[in-house]
Amino acid sequence: NISGLYVVGDLTGIPLLKFSADTGARAVQHILTDGVFQRDKGPVEIMDLAIVGAGVSGMSATLEARKAGLSFVQFEATEPFSTVVNFPKEKPIYTYPTEMVPAGDMRFVAQIKESLVAELYEQTLAQGIEPTLARVERVEKRGDHFELHIPDRENVKARRVVIGIGRSGNFRKLGVPGEDSVKVFNRLHDPVDFDDKDVLVVGGGDSALEAAIAIAQCGGRVTVSYREPDFFRPKPENVEKL
């Protein structure tokens, strides 16, 4: 644990939209109630907050920081909400737990991927939030503040840091011959691409089952390979559809 640095979103171990939004907002709320934290004190080049990542958790933190009037900067390596943008076409959205209202201002109503993207954009980008496109290589503690190292840029200094980079880029490899083939994918963009093709989906979580269901519905012949005899991780709706 590093005082003043907060990890939010998927990296906390719960990859659900509402939990991601909740952790982002609560991190900033915790900063605001921290008796040690003093905003806008000391050198003007030191920001109150730096947010790394512009996914659901990072954007939720940004909304909370702006509402509180903090000086902040947000960095995103690819594009805002990249994980959601890269969901399969027309992927169904389940906002579990249904009764949960996450901390902060971000809300979820959409039931398919495209509507969710539009909904998220409307709540953030359309409201003037503009993350800086840059990859943060590392974060170092320097006394009472942090320094963010960014290639080809001057280091950025901040009193507090929120890390919401997600886990979508860290896909697990099987360690088997042939997995580097052009026929092997770690993400499904459009299931229509697999019409009338034989497809092996490896995995037993929601992503794997949703990919298998979508490909089958679009005319693909699908086999699911899972290391357990039963599915216990996916949502009941996905198991029923399979």
Residue ranges and their predicted role:
Residues 58, 138, 168-170, 208:
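Glycine-rich nucleotide phosphate-binding loop and flanking beta-alpha elements
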Residues 20-22, 65, 87-91, 175-179, ...:
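Short, glycine/charged-enriched secondary-structure capping and boundary segments
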Residues 158-159, 196:
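Active-site acidic short loop of glycosyltransferases
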Residues 1-73, 77, 187-234:
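Rossmann-like dinucleotide/flavin-binding elements
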Residues 152, 160-189:
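Glycine-rich beta-alpha-beta "Rossmann" dinucleotide-binding loop(s) and their flanking helix/strand
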Residues 85-155, 231-242:
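N-terminal Rossmann-like dinucleotide/flavin-binding domain of flavoprotein oxidoreductases
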